[in-house]
Regions:
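Juxtamembrane intracellular "pre-TM" segments in multi-pass secondary transporters
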Residues: 9-26, 211-253
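Intracellular juxtamembrane helix-capping segments at the cytosolic ends
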Residues: 50, 133-147, 353-366
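Helix-to-loop junctions at the C-terminal end of transmembrane segments
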Residues: 78-91, 297-311
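Cytoplasmic helix-loop-helix junction between adjacent transmembrane helices
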Residues: 125-161
Length: 379
């Protein structure tokens, strides 16, 4: 029967499309994961050394907090431009551009530490934050082709891979410092020599291997399914209006933003706090590694929980865990590195719950045409 034959043909075509999308999604997850291993190695090493380097170059410990502040500021300022770049040209160009800018930032950090110039150093750290923004947006790139039931798990797989580079990164601080000294630079700046090298490889990998582009493919599939052209890219005002119009999106936005603010506020001063307690780079590196392990290591379980019991429940668990870690960190003396490590581990787990579940909730709570800009605005 003609109608039956047409239905069978349509079913077979849908199956082939789904199978092709599945293969592309698996490849996308592999490429993003490998890039984040390399990028995570660089970024987490910078967390360990940024504040110490600012204090060393400026000669003022009171300015140490500006190191991580500059990185976070750079990530925040560049998040929306990178999202717009991705919306126009695809994730491949957006992410590779972010990593490339981070490499330039790492080079400026080295120049600023050698000069020495605190201003150039802070400018480099700010530009280095663009690589952080690219890493954060990678988790959203992992969901472009995800079926609705797998958004949390696909996102968390990519976040989990960050843990490999991020946990190792702080522990290469000492050999990286030796590299800096061998080059005649302030020792801590060697961390950024290693960081820049890792991010270069991440940029090249994304640029060459993230094909077909997941965002452009997802957009094309939607257009074919609906028969409609893609709507124009929304303005920043329209993006925030779209987030504000959806209660789940508002919760997701608040979860990601507030969790990140609380986490960074405590993490940024930990190396200096431990330094005041007489601990060296090795202990600082271990504590930051424990913190980063909490942030990323359990993300697959967090993503699975978000898909199974709901993102809101996981966000609530994360908020309570962060509160416990924050109280412990606030009361821990600088000599108690173990207590500080436990506090930052709890802080990391809570951040993971709020960030992974919040990002998954945001992705599912805004229309497809708003997603890249909403994701960038949230970051």
């Amino acid at each position: 029967h003609p109608s039956y034959a047409a239905a069978v043909t349509l079913t077979e075509k849908d199956a082939r499309v789904a199978d092709d999308a599945g293969r592309v999604q698996r490849r996308t997850l592999v490429v993003l994961s490998l890039a984040l291993v390399l990028g995570g190695l660089g970024v987490s090493g910078a967390v360990t050394g940024g504040g110490l380097l600012v204090a060393e170059v400026s000669g003022r410990e009171s300015l140490a907090g500006l190191g991580q502040t500059s990185v976070v500021l750079g990530a925040a300022v560049m998040a929306v431009p990178l999202a717009r770049l991705s919306a126009r040209f695809g994730r491949r160009i957006g992410l590779a551009s972010g990593y490339a800018a981070g490499v330039v930032g790492a080079a400026l950090v080295v120049v600023g530490s050698a000069a020495p110039s605190t201003l150039v150093l802070l400018l480099g750290l700010t530009l280095f934050g663009t690589a952080v923004a690219a890493g954060l947006q990678s988790r959203f790139a992992a969901t472009d082709l995800s079926p609705p039931a797998r958004v949390g798990r696909d996102l968390s797989v990519v976040v989990w891979m960050t843990s490999v580079g991020a946990v190792v990164g702080p522990n290469v601080a000492q050999p990286a410092a030796a590299t800096g000294a061998a080059l005649g630079l302030p020792g801590v700046s060697g961390i950024f020599v290693w960081s820049g090298a890792g991010i270069v490889v991440a940029a090249v990998l994304v640029l060459l291997a993230l094909r077909p582009d997941p965002l452009l493919l997802a957009r094309r599939r939607r257009a074919e399914a609906t028969g409609a052209d893609d709507p124009p890219r929304p303005s920043l005002r329209a993006t925030f209006a779209g987030i504000g119009a959806s209660p789940p999106a508002r919760l997701a936005f608040a979860s990601v933003v507030l969790a990140h603010a609380a986490m960074v506020g405590l993490m940024v001063m930990t190396p200096l706090h431990l330094d005041h307690g007489g601990h060296g780079l090795r202990v600082v590196g271990v504590v930051i590694s424990v913190h980063v392990a909490g942030m990323y290591l359990f993300s697959p379980l967090v993503g699975a929980a978000a898909d199974a019991v709901g993102e809101v429940a996981v966000i609530a668990i994360g908020a309570l865990t962060m509160a416990a870690g924050g109280v412990l960190a606030a009361t821990a003396p600088s000599t108690a590195s173990t207590t500080v490590g436990v506090a930052l581990f709890l802080l990391g787990i809570g951040w993971s719950c709020c960030s992974v579940a919040g990002a998954a909730l945001l992705t599912s709570s805004v229309p497809p045409e708003l997603r890249p800009s909403a994701q960038g605005a949230t970051d």
